[in-house]
Amino acid sequence: MKFVDEVSIRVKAGDGGNGCMSFRREKFIENGGPNGGDGGDGGSIFMVADVNLNTLVDYRYTRHFDAERGSNGGSADCTGRKGEELVLRVPVGTTIIDATTQEIIGDLTKDGQRLMVAQGGWHGLGNTRFKSSTNRAPRQTTPGKPGDQRDLKLELKVLADVGLLGLPNAGKSTFIRSVSAAKPKVADYPFTTLVPNLGVVSVDRWKSFVVADIPGLIEGASDGAGLGIRFLKHLARTRLLLHLVDMAPLDESSAPDAAEVIVNELEKFSPSLAERDRWLVLNKCDQILEEEQEARKQEIVDRLEWTGPVYVISAIAKEGTEQLTRDIMRYLEERSQRIAEEPGYAEELAELDQRIEDEARAQLQALDDQRALRRSGVKSVHDIGDDDWDEEDVDDEDGPEIIYVRD
């Protein structure tokens, strides 16, 4: 199975049918007059959000989509048949962008939401339309108008309430397995997670929220290193970020240093995303002695100058996870209530969301431009001395392509 979250396609709506020039011919009736019908409208192209889809792989290899042309008009005032509409189904959370103008055409965030991306051409007029008291036999018709043609860029951002941040092997996948029914791959090597994973966390009856796990970040991720930078955009629509830190790294590296790396990369990618509400979650507390936990915790808090909520958990042992999920549910409910009661707060969050979207798109566009320079054999000024790339990057035209191999 291949996960694709960015594609470029071209859509062409159907042209309108031409008007018909025809005259009535009947026995014993001279100069029967015009009876040419109008053409049919061209078919339009729509995109519909489908909750059953979770990737844009269907548009990875088929990139040109044409709607049906309207039929020409006929004699006896027959109107041409309209072109059939073309419906393209995409996952919920897909943003449609005009590749030429970079204008955001629409954002499909609800199942069944429908958006027209290309308008079919208007029908041509038959010669009957031009009949008048002074022109009884018009020979004038009009052709159908051409349908819209657009180059589109589709971007998929998963919809989740909570996003997980952390270095590889910080325990993000273990956490999501611990609190939900999702079963992402877990192993003792970096970059086990290659694509975003979603898990639904049920707290009480009729109360639940969605958690998104993305590939781990590494130092230099904001400059294109590793996998996580391209998937950070999936956290743009979350309401809360959980920063997971490994309290007992296997390589005996510094936990405070690891925590600081994530904060720095997040701020470089999008300063506005760094303003999103974020909780610090110290994982793998079962790997260190109980009397050392407080000292390790304080060391990380002091390094980050942290003033927000801090949780010490063990995802694999499910220690502290229940309290954390209940606090998250309470936070989300209070946040929703505040949005409903305080219009100013809602506007503030909407402005923050827009800034995050703009910064994320600008950052990813810069990385795409950089990769295009490499593909053409030219290095940018910022890339001088940077050899951290391989031929696989050259072949990847639409961002990351991840292949799942089942054992």
From Swiss-Prot:
Keywords: Cytoplasm, GTP-binding, Hydrolase, Magnesium, Metal-binding, Nucleotide-binding. It is an enzyme of class 3 (hydrolase). GO terms for biological process: ribosome biogenesis. It is found in: Cytoplasm. Its cofactor is Mg(2+). PROSITE patterns: G_OBG, GTP1_OBG, OBG. Residues 160-333 form the OBG-type G domain. InterPro entries: G_OBG, GTP-bd, GTP-bd_Obg/CgtA, GTP1-OBG_CS, GTP1_OBG_dom, GTP1_OBG_dom_sf, OBG_GTPase, P-loop_NTPase. GO terms for molecular function: GTP binding; GTPase activity; magnesium ion binding. Mg(2+) binds at S173, T193. Its main location: cytoplasm. Gene3D superfamilies: GTP1/OBG domain, P-loop containing nucleotide triphosphate hydrolases. Residues 129-143 have a biased composition (Polar residues). GTP binds at residues 166-173, 191-195, 213-216, 283-286, 314-316. Its EC number is 3.6.5.-. GO terms for cellular component: cytoplasm. Residues 1-159 form the Obg domain. It holds the Pfam family MMR_HSR1. Residues 127-149, 376-407 are annotated as: Disordered. Coiled coil: none annotated. Signal peptide: none annotated. NCBIfam families: Obg_CgtA, PRK12297.1, PRK12299.1. Monomer. An essential GTPase which binds GTP, GDP and possibly (p)ppGpp with moderate affinity, with high nucleotide exchange rates and a fairly low GTP hydrolysis rate. Plays a role in control of the cell cycle, stress response, ribosome biogenesis and in those bacteria that undergo differentiation, in morphogenesis control. Belongs to the TRAFAC class OBG-HflX-like GTPase superfamily. OBG GTPase family. This is GTPase Obg. It comes from Pseudomonas savastanoi pv. phaseolicola (strain 1448A / Race 6). The gene is obg.
